[in-house]
């Protein structure tokens, strides 16, 4: 006599996905960070889009628009806090995910590890682009902190920083 969860078509899908999932015996909570990264990324994109609908980057009105988001937009303060803390949580999960890979020796799988390194560099490049380039909404402080190390290169450092910034667009409290 077979169990209904293994013979019924719909229950068989659930059984194979959740109950009899073919996973290694050493799986632990360390293996959740890839999924948590996806959740954090969806959270960042969705809250960022809603915040961008109400934010103005002009130096005279930027603070007022943030105040408007916090006071007048329904649950705007929640969006701000989720977006700010979601960014920190994203990078915590990212570093823990890399740390788990180092701990369990995943670097021995060269192709998989190289894809992960490329994704890490792409994440850092995307974070830079998100800070500096779109809509002129990032602060002068953020752009200078991220590119500060490049300015220490002799002879070409300042020109390299200006080239990465995209010219002289970085000169005020916000990039407009």
UniProtKB/Swiss-Prot annotation:
Q: What is this protein called?
A: Cytochrome b
What other facts are recorded? Heme 1 (or BL or b562) is low-potential and absorbs at about 562 nm, and heme 2 (or BH or b566) is high-potential and absorbs at about 566 nm.
Annotated residues that bind heme b b566 are located at 97
Q: How does it assemble?
A: The cytochrome bc1 complex contains 11 subunits: 3 respiratory subunits (MT-CYB, CYC1 and UQCRFS1), 2 core proteins (UQCRC1 and UQCRC2) and 6 low-molecular weight proteins (UQCRH/QCR6, UQCRB/QCR7, UQCRQ/QCR8, UQCR10/QCR9, UQCR11/QCR10 and a cleavage product of UQCRFS1). This cytochrome bc1 complex then forms a dimer.
- Record carries keyword Mitochondrion: yes
Could you tell me where this protein is found in the cell?
Mitochondrion inner membrane
Cofactor(s) needed by this chain: heme b
**This protein's record includes keyword rRNA-binding:** no
Q: Which spans are transmembrane here? A: 33-53, 77-98, 113-133
**One GO cellular component term noted in the UniProt record for this chain:** mitochondrial inner membrane
Which UniProt keywords are given for this protein, alphabetically ordered? Electron transport, Heme, Iron, Membrane, Metal-binding, Mitochondrion, Mitochondrion inner membrane, Respiratory chain, Transmembrane, Transmembrane helix, Transport, Ubiquinone
List the SUPFAM superfamilies hit by this protein, alphabetically. Transmembrane di-heme cytochromes
Family to which this protein belongs: Belongs to the cytochrome b family.
Residues reported to bind heme b b562: 83
Gene Ontology molecular function, alphabetical: metal ion binding; ubiquinol-cytochrome-c reductase activity
Q: How does it sit in the membrane?
A: Multi-pass membrane protein
Q: Give a short account of what the protein does.
A: Component of the ubiquinol-cytochrome c reductase complex (complex III or cytochrome b-c1 complex) that is part of the mitochondrial respiratory chain. The b-c1 complex mediates electron transfer from ubiquinol to cytochrome c. Contributes to the generation of a proton gradient across the mitochondrial membrane that is then used for ATP synthesis.
Q: Name one GO biological process term.
A: mitochondrial electron transport, ubiquinol to cytochrome c
By its UniProt entry, which InterPro entries does this protein fall under?
Cyt_b/b6_N, Cytb/b6-like_sf, Cytochrome_b_N_euk/bac, Di-haem_cyt_TM
Could you tell me what the cofactor note in this record states?
A: Binds 2 heme b groups non-covalently.
